From Swiss-Prot:
This is Nucleoside diphosphate kinase. The keyword Nucleotide-binding applies. NCBIfam families: PRK00668.1. It is found in: Cytoplasm. Pfam families: NDK. The keyword Kinase applies. GO terms for molecular function: ATP binding; metal ion binding; nucleoside diphosphate kinase activity. ATP binds at residues 9, 57, 85, 91, 102, 112. Its cofactor is Mg(2+).
C-alpha cells in the first residue's frame, strides 16, 4: 500500500483545525499509519527543506515552520501521494479548488496549512526523516 507524508503546518495547528484536516484524509480513504505533534528545531526545518536552500523564500519558510508545533503524519492508501495532493489543493490557496484543505483552511501561499510529499521517492525520504520503522503501523 502506498504511503505519503503529511505535515499540518503551524498556521493550521494554531487555528485548531487539526481534526478537520485529519477527517479529510480519513473520509477520502487515507489511513493514518503514524502521527505525532512536534516543535521543529531550526536545524530540523533547514534539513527537511534543504532542497529549497538556494530559493529566496527558504529563510522565511524555515522561520514559519518553527513558529509553532506541527502535526506530522504518515498516510497510507491507494495512490496516497496523488490523493493527498488533490485533497490539499494548489500551493497558493487563492488558486486552490473549493473544498480542498488549502482553500478551506489556508491564509496565504506561505501559511498554506499543509505539506504533502510530491512523489513516492520523496515520500520515503520524508517519512524516514520523521519516523522510525516501528512507529508506522
Amino acid at each position: 500500500m502506498e504511503k505519503t507524508l503529511s505535515i499540518i503546518k503551524p498556521d493550521a495547528v494554531k487555528k485548531g483545525v487539526i481534526g478537520k484536516i485529519l477527517d479529510r484524509f480519513e473520509s477520502n480513504g487515507l489511513r493514518i499509519a503514524a502521527m505525532k505533534k512536534v516543535q521543529l528545531s531550526k536545524e530540523q526545518a533547514e534539513n527537511f527543506y534543504a532542497v529549497h536552500k538556494e530559493r529566496p523564500f527558504f529563510k522565511d519558510l524555515v522561520e514559519f515552520m518553527i513558529s509553532g508545533p506541527v502535526v506530522v503524519s504518515v498516510l497510507e492508501g491507494e495512490g496516497a501521494v496523488l490523493k493527498n495532493r488533490d485533497l490539499m489543493g494548489a500551493t497558493n490557496p487563492k488558486e486552490a479548488k473549493a473544498g480542498t484543505i488549502r482553500a478551506d483552511f489556508a491564509e496565504s501561499i506561505d501559511a498554506n496549512a499543509v505539506h504533502g510529499s510530491d512523489s513516492l521517492e520523496n515520500a520515503k525520504i520524508e517519512i524516514d526523516f520523521f519516523f522510525k520503522p516501528n512507529e508506522i503501523c
